[in-house]
């Protein structure tokens, strides 16, 4: 069994990518060439539960599809960053803005 040497109770925010994290690593394509992103219902429930318990949540993805925005905003996540090819500065700014 592994050991974690930090206090998980101090975690106040979570940042997630979509592709391969909140969706399968394989992305089917529509005939138009647009990616079809499939999401797991259980992930959505877990994200809503985390919000309910006061965690700050951000979605940070290089993809830029309306369906991704609609899905995560529909779960109550207000910080959805689409088209983020360079993610670190966006995440750092989000952390500063949220006191994390």
Question: Could you tell me what each predicted segment is?
Answer:
Residues 22-53:
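A positional/architectural concept
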Residues 47-71, 81-82:
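Substrate-recognition element of Asp-dependent hydrolases with the DxDx(T/V) motif
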Residues 9-22, 62-65:
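Short, compositionally biased "basic patch" segments
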Residues 42, 63-64, 86:
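Short beta->alpha linker loops
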Residues 18, 31, 97:
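Short, ordered coil/turn segments that flank beta-strands lining enzyme active or ligand-binding pockets
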Residues 1-16, 99:
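Non-catalytic pre-domain segments flanking phosphatase-related domains
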Residues 13, 68-100:
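C-terminal cap/substrate-recognition subdomain and adjoining C-terminal extension
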């Amino acid at each position: 069994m592994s050991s974690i040497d930090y206090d998980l109770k101090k975690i106040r925010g979570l940042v997630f990518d979509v592709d391969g994290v909140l969706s399968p690593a394989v992305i089917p394509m529509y005939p138009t060439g647009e990616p079809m992103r499939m999401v797991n219902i259980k992930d959505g429930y877990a994200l809503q539960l985390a919000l309910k318990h006061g965690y700050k949540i951000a979605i940070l993805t290089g993809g830029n599809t309306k369906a991704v925005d609609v899905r995560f905003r529909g779960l109550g996540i207000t910080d959805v960053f689409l088209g983020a090819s360079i993610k670190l500065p966006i995440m750092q700014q989000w952390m500063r803005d949220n006191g994390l």
